[in-house]
Amino acid sequence: MAQTLTGKRILIISPQSWGNMSLSKHHYAIELARKGNAVYFLNPPGEENTRGKAAISILPLRVAPDLWLIEHRIWFPYRLKFHALPLFHLLMKSHLSRVIKKIGGPVDVIWSFDLGNLYPFRLFSGRPVKIFHPVDEPLNQVAIDSGKGADIIFSVTKEILEKYNVFPAPGHFINHGVAEEFSAKVPVAWEKSFPIHVGLSGNWTRPDIDTASLLRIIREQPAVLFEFWGSYQVADSNIGGDNNPAIEKFIRELQYSSNVTLHGPIPSAQLAAELHRMDAFLICYDVQKDQSKGTNYHKVMEYLSTGKVIISNNITTYRDRPDLIQMIQERDNNEKLPDLFNAVISRIEQHNADSLREARVSYAIDNTYKKQLERIEALL
């Protein structure tokens, strides 16, 4: 394809809305705009317009030049997707034509992170470069079908790429990136805090958190202060979540724990500064329920950028890098995670030695979104 990613009109298709919490698709949109492209971030569609008309608005996002947010509501029933998919896609093609017209003309690149097959590549007219970028595990045929028609596929795990071998498009591993807000902060010399501060960031309304193991660790470590960033109410989340009684009970237990602080969602730049205060980080997902199946997580790069030790459930992408992450070996349970946490915290000076902190920071800096775009550009 021999494409450069400068001076292009790019449509980013995201299954998560723009908001306080940022994931890969949000960071790629920002970095592409900084690189001199006109970038349009397509939010998931809102509820159907009962007046029978498409509602489309395009507003500037102030975080980068020439970065635009597309808010839209379809004029046909969304439930058609589940009962009459060919008709849904036919109507969606018409809707997308209106979106492209509202943008002001054809786009040069369609960059899709969508696993819901809302907008098959064949619905777009012209000859844009079609990039498919799944960052979560494809759990059903709909997610696999979402890659059909792509010119090239990128993913953050080799396991995900293997599932798209059914298509002729070449697939390439590109690790999660780290945003400029994190990589630009120079870590200072570390001194252990009293009490030790352990950081956790993410969406705490997700159903794949291993709440039992996490609460056990918190209870068994009363001398450690656990600081949580991210949504703990579904209403505050722009990246999904669940509001079932089990999650509500989990959040209440966190709120009532004397060694827990819930900060809620904050902007990336502020989060970067807060994470640098930490002595260590904890990741605790149930791999069997996890949307990434314990293969990779976006937050890992952000944690590594601080240089501090990470204690985690098993993550296959880093299984051969104990210098980067201290993880358990088991894939079917986290029963040994509390013991691992205790062992690492007990020897935190060793795990946060200068050489290890420098290695973690160096790894993160080699995976900035700017560098990931350079790698992607070389493959186009």
Q: What is each stretch, according to the model?
A:
Residues 19-23, 269-274, 283-304, 311-322:
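Nucleotide-sugar-dependent
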Residues 36, 279, 307-308:
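A short alpha->beta transition loop at the rim of the catalytic pocket in nucleotide-sugar-dependent
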Residues 141-144, 178-194:
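Acidic anion/phosphate-binding donor-loop and adjacent secondary structure
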Residues 159, 176-177:
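Carbohydrate-associated surface elements
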Residues 190-209, 214-221, 226-229, 365:
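Conserved donor-binding/catalytic core segment of Leloir-type glycosyltransferases
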Residues 230, 239-272:
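Nucleotide-activated donor-binding/catalytic signature segment of Leloir-type glycosyltransferases, i.e.
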Residues 332-335, 349-380:
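A charged, aromatic-enriched C-terminal amphipathic alpha-helix characteristic of glycosyltransferases
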